[in-house]
């Protein structure tokens, strides 16, 4: 494979540390793998520190602490402090469950730069159904205010889907009431548990149009009243005609280390039929530069038609490899989101099906250890029959 030297020599600028798959919530759109409960061993404090040292030596500058719920790691303050001392810009991506004012103060003292808190909905009732926690909504509100009190920008994330998209006005009103600085309205992308629940979660075309119009109206309101809140609406792939560049370019910017030490180009890459090395077996630098899995989709030599001759191939790099594999079972295929894909009709059909289906929220398969273990058992039983 001909990999351009310019791509080989670029360091991963963004390191995502998935500290744990453990989580107190059970969101049906979680991007964690379905069989996450099969992961029994997490990297130790010293192993994570070694990962951070290696990444920083390569040139990584931003470090995200994620999960699962990273607050469940008892060594989180220690890891934040160590990453700060190495010179990382650090970001905590959290549900807010388990967060306290004391912990926020500890994290601030340790050098944490940024905190993002996720919400499920704009009201306690729907939040409880989606998260599985009766107290989650009030806790998130309190911690969003506490983050602001400790002089962090308030950054909120709402995953938008069929069951909460019509709350878009109330979601934005809640964000304004909390005086949020940044609000990410991230329409559900279908990986992990979200893919399992796609038929229930995918919004209708009318819902998408409504949400886009309301966000634009609120942006105008915010400008007219000189408010500081910034609204970012992330459109779903399934309502695009051209694919997005896979994670900013496969093996170009982003690197993920899973709780067990598996090193990935993105969080969903485990779904691909590739062998991904672990940090216990090879150095991060060796994995980034030499592992076949990281070089598999660098450059454009790997592309099949219609990508190979497409004038946009350097712009979108063929789209998302995980999405291509999920829908075609060919990881080299054109992302079916692209209208030039020979199976783009699958995307169109998924949109149309939303207009003739009426899913109930009880249809959702929740992300919890019981369901994960059941999925793992079924997958193991299927493998034993091969």
UniProtKB/Swiss-Prot annotation:
Chain ranges passing through the membrane: none
What molecular functions are annotated in GO for this chain?
Answer: 4 iron, 4 sulfur cluster binding; cyclase activity; iron ion binding; oxidoreductase activity; S-adenosyl-L-methionine binding
Q: One of this protein's GO BP terms?
A: pyrroloquinoline quinone biosynthetic process
- The enzyme's E.C. designation: 1.21.98.4
Q: Which Pfam families match?
A: Fer4_12 (PF13353), Radical_SAM (PF04055), SPASM (PF13186)
Assembly notes: Interacts with PqqD. The interaction is necessary for activity of PqqE.
Return the protein name. Answer: PqqA peptide cyclase
């Amino acid at each position: 494979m001909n990999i351009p030297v310019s791509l080989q020599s670029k360091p991963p600028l963004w390191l995502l540390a998935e500290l744990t798959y453990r989580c107190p919530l059970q969101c049906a759109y979680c991007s964690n793998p379905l069989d996450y409960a099969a992961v029994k061993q997490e990297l130790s404090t010293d192993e994570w520190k070694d990962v951070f040292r290696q990444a920083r030596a390569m040139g990584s500058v931003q470090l995200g602490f994620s999960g699962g719920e990273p607050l469940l790691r008892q060594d989180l303050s220690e890891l934040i402090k160590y990453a700060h001392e190495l010179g990382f810009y650090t970001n905590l991506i959290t549900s807010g469950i388990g967060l306290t004012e004391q912990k926020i103060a500890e994290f601030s003292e340790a050098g944490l730069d940024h905190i993002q808190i996720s919400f499920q909905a704009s009201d306690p009732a729907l939040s409880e159904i989606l998260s599985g926690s009766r107290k989650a909504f009030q806790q998130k509100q309190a911690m969003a205010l506490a983050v602001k009190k400790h002089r962090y920008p308030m950054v909120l994330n709402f995953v938008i889907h069929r069951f909460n998209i019509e709350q878009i006005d109330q979601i934005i009103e809640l964000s304004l009431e909390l005086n949020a600085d940044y609000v990410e309205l991230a329409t559900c992308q279908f990986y992990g548990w979200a893919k399992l629940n796609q038929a229930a979660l995918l919004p209708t075309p009318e819902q998408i149009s409504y949400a886009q119009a309301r966000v634009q109206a609120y942006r105008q309101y915010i400008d007219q009243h000189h408010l500081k809140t910034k609204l970012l609406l992330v459109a779903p792939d399934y309502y695009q005609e051209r694919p997005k560049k896979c994670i900013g370019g496969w093996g170009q910017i982003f690197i993920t280390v899973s709780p067990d030490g598996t090193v990935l180009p993105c969080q969903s890459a485990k779904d691909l039929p590739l062998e991904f090395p672990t940090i216990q077996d090879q150095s991060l630098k060796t994995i980034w530069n030499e592992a076949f899995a990281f070089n598999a989709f660098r450059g454009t030599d790997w592309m099949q038609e219609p990508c190979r001759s497409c004038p946009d191939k350097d712009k979108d790099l063929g789209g998302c490899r995980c999405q291509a594999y999920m829908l075609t079972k060919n990881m080299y295929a054109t992302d079916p989101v692209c209208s030039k894909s020979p199976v783009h009709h699958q995307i169109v059909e998924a949109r149309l099906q939303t207009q003739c289906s009426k899913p109930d929220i009880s249809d959702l398969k929740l992300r919890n250890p019981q369901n994960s273990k059941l999925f793992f058992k079924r997958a193991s039983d299927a493998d034993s029959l091969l």
